[in-house]
Amino acid sequence: MITRKEMTRMLLKEGLLSCLANHSFESVTVTLLCKASGITRSTFYLHYSNIMEIVDDLVDDAIAYSKPGMVDNNNLQTIANTLSAASNSVSLREAYDSIFDRLPLCQRIIRHKKYLPLFLDEQISEYVLQRIIGREKDRQGLVIAESLGISFDVGVSVFVFLVHGLYAVNKQYKWSQSDEWLEAQKIIFELVYRGLQSR
């Protein structure tokens, strides 16, 4: 059974997502958030000291929803080869779905549209990306380092580059996972994999 505390936090998180659909993060005040959530300011301050704490909770929820992905030394190769084998948009979508658990966390999170407002707002999107990078960098950096024979720190740098690049492409396509977007994903993963292979 859900506790009152959990219910209140859930209402505030849903309220913030609702506010972000119509307002910039910068313009969301505690008063506006409380009105959208149907709770009082004093109740807000019993659970959070500021709105960024709700953003943190939402990112944590999105990460938990997305579940840990499959990561191994052949991850990039598996993704690139699976997508490359697709001959048309239908088989490409099927290929993408088949390797979905291997995709970087930033790609898996956006599949759940509920969390999309966190990525759409210019003021908090970089903060959200940094939280995602912080959660994944040790695991992803190590895999990249081992597969390329480079230092862990350089592996993390490659991972950060990939996350920001994929974010930029998602933003360019306005977060719609269209056939054209999917083709771009295929080319990006092929390009990165081939580039790393030539090293």
PLM regions: where:
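Alpha-helical bundle regulatory/interaction domains
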Residues: 1-23, 30-32, 36, 40-199
